[in-house]
C-alpha cells in the first residue's frame, strides 16, 4: 500500500507539472490586456483560465436560460454568498438587459428565502429522507 501511495503521489505530481500553460511574455501581456480578471490567475494557468472564463461567460449570452434571467439567477446567488464584486455587476447587467427593480428585488428575495429555509432545515437537523418523501 505504501508503494502504491508513493507512486500515486509521483504520478499526480508529474501531471501537475504537465498541466501548466506555457505562456510567453507577449502572450501574457495580451491576456492581461484582454480582461482585468486574468490578473487573478497565476501565469502557470493563465491560458486555461482565460479559456474557461470565456466559456463560462457564454452561459449568460448563449445558454438555454435567457441572458437577463441568467443574471437574475447569478444576482440571487451573489446576494446569498454576499459577494461585493458580483452583486453590482449582475444588477448592472440585469438592468442593461431590461430587468425591472421588481424583478431584481424578487431575485434577491428568492435567494434570501432559500437561505432561510436551508438554515432552518439544517440547523434543526430536519430528516432529509422524510423531506424527500414529502415531495413525492
Regions found by a protein language model. Name each.
Residues 4-6, 10, 18-69, 122-136:
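Acidic, glycine/proline-rich low-complexity segments that act as flexible tails and inter-domain linkers
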Residues 49, 88-104:
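Iron-sulfur (Fe-S) cluster-binding segments and ferredoxin-like electron-carrier domains
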Residues 57, 74, 91-95:
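Amphipathic alpha-helical segments within well-ordered protein domains
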Residues 72, 103-109:
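Beta-strand segments within the central parallel beta-sheet cores of soluble alpha/beta enzyme folds
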Residues 73, 77-89:
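Short, thiol/selenol-centered motifs that function as redox-active sites or metal-ligating centers
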Residues 85-88, 92, 116-120:
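Charged/polar positions within long, soluble alpha-helices
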Residues 107-126:
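Short Fe-S-cluster ligation motifs
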Amino acid at each position: 500500500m505504501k508503494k502504491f501511495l508513493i507512486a500515486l503521489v509521483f504520478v499526480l505530481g508529474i501531471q501537475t507539472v504537465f498541466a501548466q500553460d506555457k505562456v510567453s511574455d507577449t502572450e501574457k501581456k495580451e491576456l492581461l490586456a484582454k480582461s482585468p480578471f486574468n490578473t487573478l490567475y497565476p501565469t502557470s494557468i493563465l491560458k486555461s483560465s482565460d479559456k474557461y472564463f470565456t466559456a463560462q461567460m457564454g452561459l449568460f449570452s448563449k445558454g438555454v436560460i435567457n441572458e437577463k434571467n441568467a443574471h437574475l439567477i447569478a444576482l440571487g446567488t451573489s446576494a446569498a454568498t454576499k459577494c461585493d464584486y458580483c452583486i453590482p455587476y449582475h444588477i448592472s447587467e440585469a438592468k442593461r438587459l431590461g430587468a425591472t427593480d421588481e424583478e431584481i428585488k424578487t431575485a434577491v428575495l428568492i435567494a434570501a428565502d432559500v437561505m432561510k429555509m436551508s438554515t432552518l432545515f439544517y440547523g434543526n437537523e430536519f430528516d432529509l429522507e422524510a423531506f424527500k418523501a414529502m415531495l413525492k
